[in-house]
């Protein structure tokens, strides 16, 4: 994807500034912190879509990404690790953005990201039946 189609967004995790590279038009809602669980929540919202991505990050350094479908109300976990990797978040959102542009917006997009040998492997993207 060309750099002029990406926008950098600053997001704070554990007092550290992280810069995420989002597709043009996407919004990153200011993180909220749940004082009871020390959980930080960020919503990544694409333009004119029927879904958004939820990032949850807690004090034990556990990071999860969820795909949330506005039509069905389903939330599917797409990433879960004991660390925050901004490049994984960037790749995940870029993949979801590309799939949406190919008319997958009305379907629940499921895919898995794993970390092996320091490289991320994007595997299996499906349309729900």
From Swiss-Prot:
Keyword vocabulary terms for this entry: Activator, DNA-binding, Plasmid, Transcription, Transcription regulation
GO MF annotations, alphabetized: DNA binding
Highest taxon of the lineage: Bacteria
Keyword Transcription: yes
Function: Positive regulatory protein of bfpA, the gene coding for the bundle-forming pilus of EPEC.
Protein name: Protein PerB
Organism whose genome encodes this protein: Escherichia coli O127:H6 (strain E2348/69 / EPEC)
Gene name, Swiss-Prot/TrEMBL: perB
